[in-house]
Amino acid sequence: MTNIEQIEGLLFVAGDEGITVAEIEHATGFAKPAITTMLTQLATKYQADPDSALMILSTANTYRLATKAAVAPVLKRYFEAPLTTSLSQASLEVLAIIAYRQPLTRIEIDEIRGVHSGSTIQKLVLRQLVTETGRLSEPGRPILYGTTELFLDYFGLKSLDDLPAIDLAALSDAEHPAPETDLFLNAFQDKLQAEREDE
């Protein structure tokens, strides 16, 4: 694995929050000048490759992967599925985690699920079921996510207080995140369905 590959991997997992040079230095042990040089090289590589949809954006010493403007129409069609289309298993899983644990960051969601959740979160944001509620006051200023009014309407809830009570202890086992998350999601879906049938 090359040094640039390591930086590219960090950019990917950092998602929309991005990553600072200091954070890359901490994760890799590379010197800051070398990191800046490799970020420039990677950005140039993306820009020069007509078959790559990626680019690197930098703001206030924070770097993040983004997609080139040319692919925007395709991404728009992918993300803006009509609300009449049922949510995927991954979307329901992320939505349930946000609903019960909000506000929380993408990294916290990733830790609970055991997989990268960036694209799923963005799809939920574009469908207006999830929104940015603030940012943590720590390096990188990670985005905090919460549910929207449309989320309540979508699931037929009057407020977050109407969410069915479930055992959140299943989410506390960091060593086995996926099975516990599955149980959590199943409880979320089953109890919502049961409450609808009782109405």
From Swiss-Prot:
Keywords linked to the UniProt accession: Cell cycle, Cell division, Chromosome partition, Cytoplasm
Pfam families, sorted: SMC_ScpB
Source domain of life: Bacteria
UniProt entry tagged with the keyword Cell division: yes
One Gene Ontology CC term in the entry: cytoplasm
InterPro entries registered for this protein in UniProt: ScpB_csome_segregation, WH-like_DNA-bd_sf, WH_DNA-bd_sf
Transit peptide recorded as keyword: no
Transmembrane segments: none
Cellular compartments annotated: Cytoplasm
GO terms under biological process: cell division; chromosome separation; DNA replication
Function: Participates in chromosomal partition during cell division. May act via the formation of a condensin-like complex containing Smc and ScpA that pull DNA away from mid-cell into both cell halves.
Cited NCBIfam families: SMC-Scp complex subunit ScpB
Family the entry assigns: Belongs to the ScpB family.
Subunit structure: Homodimer. Homodimerization may be required to stabilize the binding of ScpA to the Smc head domains. Component of a cohesin-like complex composed of ScpA, ScpB and the Smc homodimer, in which ScpA and ScpB bind to the head domain of Smc. The presence of the three proteins is required for the association of the complex with DNA.
PANTHER family cross-referenced by the UniProt entry: SEGREGATION AND CONDENSATION PROTEIN B
Name of this chain's protein: Segregation and condensation protein B
